[in-house]
Amino acid sequence: MEYKPIRKVVSGNYAAAYAALHARVQVVAAYPITPQTSIIEKIAEFIANGEADIQYIPVESEHSAMAACIGASATGARTFTATSAQGLALMHEMLHWAAGARLPIVMVDVNRAMAPPWSVWDDQTDSLSQRDTGWMQFYAENNQEVYDGVLMAYKVAETVNVPAMVVESAFILSHTYDVVEMIPQELVDEFLPPRKPLYSLANFDEPIAVGALATPNDYYEFRYKLAKAHEEAKKVIKEVGKEFGERFGRDYSQMIETGYIDDADFVFMGMGSLMGTVKEAVDLLRKEGYKVGYAKVRWFRPFPKEELVEIAESVKGIAVLDRNFSFGQEGILFTESKGALYNSSAHPLMKNYIVGLGGRDVTVKDIKAIADDMKKVIESGKVDKEVVWYHLKR
């Protein structure tokens, strides 16, 4: 069947819901929270209209939502949920259980700032606070990547038996409408066949226990196997991303998308919708003679160390844009990037710019101002101040 995209004007949240529908998810368990709610509402609409054969489990909290997903996934079902901010924090314990039990659940997290004070706007701290739970994390720049990301996340997760989080920006994507090219169901089915579970609690001929006590003699190896699965996932992510591109014309074979790096003195590095603004700014800066490029981190977990080293070897500096912060330290992407480069031969000048916390706008003008600051760093050959809270009101 020839690929002819079905173009719909949808929000990022509706793109996620359509992707779950097209992935033929079997069980959805979720609890509503702004700005995630319309994902689950749309899925409920699909069920009510007879468009989807999905078992929907209404629960009393996000902790229960993930617990229900764990139970469903452990029986072999393809399982989906979505949450945001405080809801994701409430899920924290169960995220460890899902990863430790090697269950390929896919969850959409709509990035929202953590309270207090209350905020419903974009901030990556909620998802990045869960970086050590064993979940893979894919960050979408736009609504198209939300849709594509969910489909690819299932294929990767079910190959390596590790859960995956697809992350989109609150309101900037979740409630903003754009054209999304959707894939005919028959072609999605060819790309994403039915799940073949690693084990199933519904297989009564081979009964097993999941999450039972492991003594010190065994626990260590369980952790090692999960770590190896994340390493294996890097290869699978590239293979799945390449296949997706060959089938549907949108290539995701690189864990870090780059632009203009061949002759760049420095690059902007960041994740999510912020990088759409960066791309526009870089296009304008290039016309003004700036030797600047960009590196958009698509997959934060597993961390694309090898690709980052290759990029770092070709530039003099990296301006890391973090829409998050680890208190007592610095931006989280900045910390991870420095650690990845420490034992490599690449040692570019690196400066961390904290931007956009709590949904504060980051404009093309802001990026151009940061470019001017980074240009001075390159010209001087030293970093004057490693971490800058850009546009801080005083």
From Swiss-Prot:
Domain of life: Archaea
The keyword Transcription appears for this protein: no
Any GO BP: organic acid metabolic process
Alphabetical UniProt keywords: Oxidoreductase
The UniProt record lists the keyword Oxidoreductase: yes
Catalytic activity of the protein: 3-methyl-2-oxobutanoate + 2 oxidized [2Fe-2S]-[ferredoxin] + CoA = 2-methylpropanoyl-CoA + 2 reduced [2Fe-2S]-[ferredoxin] + CO2 + H(+)
Enzyme class per UniProt: oxidoreductase
Leader sequence residues: none
MF GO annotations: 3-methyl-2-oxobutanoate dehydrogenase (ferredoxin) activity
EC number: 1.2.7.7
CDD domains: TPP_PYR_PFOR_IOR-alpha_like
InterPro entries documented for this protein: PFOR_II, Pyruvate:ferred/Flavod_OxRd, Pyrv_Fd/Flavodoxin_OxRdtase_N, THDP-binding, Transketo_C/PFOR_II
UniProt cross-references to PANTHER family, sorted A to Z: PYRUVATE-FLAVODOXIN OXIDOREDUCTASE-RELATED (PTHR32154:SF0)
NCBIfam families attached to this UniProt entry: PRK08366.1
Subunit structure, as described in the record: Heterotetramer of one alpha, one beta, one delta and one gamma chain.
Protein name: Ketoisovalerate oxidoreductase subunit VorA
Species this chain originates from: Pyrococcus furiosus (strain ATCC 43587 / DSM 3638 / JCM 8422 / Vc1)
Phylogenetic classification of the source organism: Archaea, Methanobacteriati, Methanobacteriota, Thermococci, Thermococcales
